[in-house]
Amino acid sequence: MTRTDGDQWDIVSSVGFTALMVSSFRALETTRTEPLIRDEYARAFVEASGEPRLTEALAAGTPESEWDTATVYLVNHLAVRTKYFDEFFAAATGSGIQQVVILAAGLDSRVYRLPWPDGTVVYELDQPKVLEFKDHVLREEHAVPLAERREVAVDLRDDWIAALRTAGFDATKPTAWLAEGLLAYLPGAAQDALFENITAHSAPGSFLATEWRRRQATAGQWQDAVNKLKPEFIKDISIGSLIYDDERQDPIEWLREHGWQVDTANRLEQAAAYGRPAPSEHSDVTSLWSDAYFITATR
């Protein structure tokens, strides 16, 4: 799954497969007695993909008490991230925002599972084949969006702002932007361009959320960490080959320098606050997250 310039993917290949893995862990979280989040569509996405490793893992129905440490770690990791950004949207829409942009939306189902104020429009941007798969599954599930959903099939390394405008985006209105689980999959120049475009098209009152590790890990470090954390059913997947570890600006500093009011939440501290602390068995891996932050910003 090595990256190349201009590479494309569907839901079972390259970066698309990571969205499917995220869905599998959200599906597992949803089966818990006291889940942090509930995503009733996550299982449907995995099952519809036909991807044997993930579908078999869900079909096994292994009770939470028998999950291995790696599964617990990853399910917790995704549940904490999902809940944090769910709360971000609650705060943004609570301020009166009715325009939402989810970048690299993947199999995000927030438009179907979160309460949205009347009149909210949610734009979902991702690769064409990913959105095609997602739309098919949601139709099969007879899913009803709780806000107006507009899909924008575009590569975020291309002129995605033009595609967003064509879909009806209004830069004069405040916007809630989400870049969840995205930055590591962009080259440094594309990340910089992403924040430049967001800033240039954010009216006063806009919100932004993303995540960042202030001490960037190399692709090799990531692969070592992931290898220790991967459950048996995805041991052969090379996540490290999908990320970019080239030089880039720290978005926390960049956003502050460009007029955003920035707040951060340490990822490990947030996990503990939600009652999902990192397992002590992987202290060396956990250290990679010790300077990882959720970022929320307003302007």
From Swiss-Prot:
What InterPro entries does the database record attribute to this sequence?
Answer: Ppm1/Ppm2/Tcmp, SAM-dependent_MTases_sf, SAM_mthyl_Trfase_ML2640-like
The positions annotated for binding S-adenosyl-L-methionine are 126, 155-156
Q: Is Chloroplast given among the entry's keywords? A: no
- The superkingdom of the source organism is Bacteria
Q: Which GO terms describe its molecular function?
A: methyltransferase activity
- Give the record's keywords alphabetically: Methyltransferase, S-adenosyl-L-methionine, Transferase
The family assignment reads: Belongs to the UPF0677 family.
Q: Name one GO biological process term.
A: methylation
What is the protein's given name?
Putative S-adenosyl-L-methionine-dependent methyltransferase MAB_0027c
| Broad enzyme group | transferase
State its role.
Exhibits S-adenosyl-L-methionine-dependent methyltransferase activity.
